[in-house]
Amino acid sequence: MGKVVGIDLGTTNSVVAVMEGGKPVVIANAEGMRTTPSVVGFSKDGERVVGQMARRQTVLNPQNTFFAVKRYIGRRYNELSPESKRVPYTIRKDDVGNIKVACPRLNKEFAAEEISAMVLKKLADDASAYLGAAVTGAVITVPAYFNDSQRQATRDAGRIAGLEVLRILNEPTAASLAYGLDRGDTETILVFDLGGGTFDVSILEVGDGVFEVKATSGDTQLGGNDFDKKIVDWLAEQFLETEGVDLRRDRQALQRLMEAAEKAKIELSAVSITDINLPFITATEDGPKHLETRLTRSQFEGLCADLLGRVRNPVKRALKDAGLRPDDIEEVVLVGGSTRMPMVKQLVRDLIGIEPSENVNPDEVVAMGAAIQAGILAGEFKDVLLLDVTPLSLGLEAIGGVMKKLIPRNTTIPVRRSDIFSTSENNQNSVEIHVVQGEREMAGDNKSLGRFKLYGIPPAPRGIPQIQVAFDIDANGILQVTALDRTTGREQSITIQGASTLSESEVNRMIQEAQKYADVDRERKERVEKRTRSEALILQGERQLREVALEFGMQFARNRRQRIDNISRELKESLKENDDRGIDQAYADLQDALYELNREVRQYYAEDEDDDLFATIKDIFVGDKDKERDLPRDSYRERDSYNNRDYGRDYGRDYGRDSRPSYDSNRPPRKSPRPSYQDNWDDDDDWL
């Protein structure tokens, strides 16, 4: 039987760990290092090198050496920012809009999943050599804020590497496993994970073997590389000002700048000033040029002020979503090499008010947590319960473009949620299920994850068919959507994978815009609902007039039709012109007109009942001989049929006033009423 390991697939570095003797152990790679650079390169001979060997050739072979591809995995080219495209190698868009990295040495293009698979393969091979047995399975960690497609792409990378991916685990959750496995008392912790390319913050309750995530937030396009780029830009701007040459346009010079920036960043975590010397960085007509300068810690912190602001916001959002104050946090666990920067530690102190824990290795704790999860799946731990959450709300598009949320963000997974929907048109034989992800009220403002159709719905008036839509999120965070016609039993489903994905900038924009434009979203939603109610009231009026004409004759209906038709026409014009005030006025007038029609019908019934009472008394005293002469009118029986129809159903549900009586009569019918359309639609049900 093959071995199972835990892998932290990082943007900058990756780590592999395994359970030994009931404890997680980090496995050193073939070069003797406990961390492996997430770098893949191809030498002059076309040989593939991974890890530290690939990193050594980045300066001399920048176009054929690929790093930080985790930022591209599961994403589309049009989602990349100009900043994320600024790397020494070439990024291209394929025919379907996905991201490819070009390798001139092999005259070939690779997907980000393929490059990541090469790193995973290196880690698995090194682990196999250490364990003396083949590694066949893995628990792989991803940022908590990775969306569905990014998680699926990570799983695909594992499959390409020949691994069975047993679980996709959120990085902060993995860190909490390694931190709190042996802790008995329950405490509330905040995991602050700032890695090379991603940032996550999660709040958990940990203790007695239970790890429950309360809230998560983050930014998958923020990490240590962004702090490096601040130094790169500072150096390049200085050189451009003094020498008139932009080093960022030279691939080799750019790679040297990036290496020097990372080195300076690391040194400034221990000292207050560092020297940066890059001899022969470029050459002009005047000869070779050198870059020599000094950078202080205070200068570096000033350059990164905006990045610290981006770090601060997710922490506040996670606290708000969890319903906690900073003083409710009992422990802060720092994860990721970038948390070693003094300004980051100080930011955590300022936000939470306590000293961060130094009990775990920020580079290794995530892989150790992944190994523990592998042990849980293998049955090595019997009394450990892990409750993770989904980072963004999931729902579908309802009538009018409104997003109907089925699974709110920070819902514990695995989870299944369902709701009942119906058709929006008469005799509609199919419905389209449009799955969206985000926090805005309107579906068009959120991210589309996929679409599929359910066919074969029996013809019926709008609102009568019942379509049950179910969302299932498994423990890996992978979403499956199922639609079921409850009348016919027909079912259609889709697993959301390979769809257009969310960039972190889009995620942050969705949440920020949802807060900024909450009032605007609410007004738009109310406007759509008002339009839907108005259109339904117009249809109700037309239906009632037809029924009245059938029961009482055209003359009775004609006297009342003109007013209702005029008001309906005004309401339609107001809807066409988007005149909110006109819609409100015409809607109220139409309600009144239909109420008056209802009142007259009930009054007509009351008079009919009085006539029947006198006829009964006459029969008692006179006998049956007058019946042949004075036969009852057929319309009497027909009126009872009309009376027992549920005309007040829609009216009482959406449009009626609570103080007004119903159209229904409790008097038993004299004969079975003529069949009419009925439905059992609830107030909370929505129309697709």
Curated annotation (Swiss-Prot):
One Pfam short name: HSP70
A single MF term (Gene Ontology): ATP-dependent protein folding chaperone
Bias (Basic and acidic residues): 630-661
Keywords: ATP-binding, Chaperone, Nucleotide-binding, Phosphoprotein, Stress response
Annotated segments matching region Disordered: 630-688
Listed PROSITE patterns: HSP70_1, HSP70_2, HSP70_3
SUPFAM superfamilies found in the cross-reference section: Actin-like ATPase domain (SSF53067), Heat shock protein 70kD (HSP70), peptide-binding domain (SSF100920)
In-chain residues carrying the UniProt-annotated modification Phosphothreonine: T198
Sections of the chain in a coiled coil: none
Induction context: By stress conditions e.g. heat shock.
Record's function text: Acts as a chaperone.
Entries under PANTHER family matching the protein: HEAT SHOCK PROTEIN 70KDA
Similarity comment: family membership: Belongs to the heat shock protein 70 family.
Record-given protein name: Chaperone protein DnaK
Organism placement in taxonomy: Bacteria, Bacillati, Cyanobacteriota, Cyanophyceae, Nostocales
Gene behind this protein: dnaK
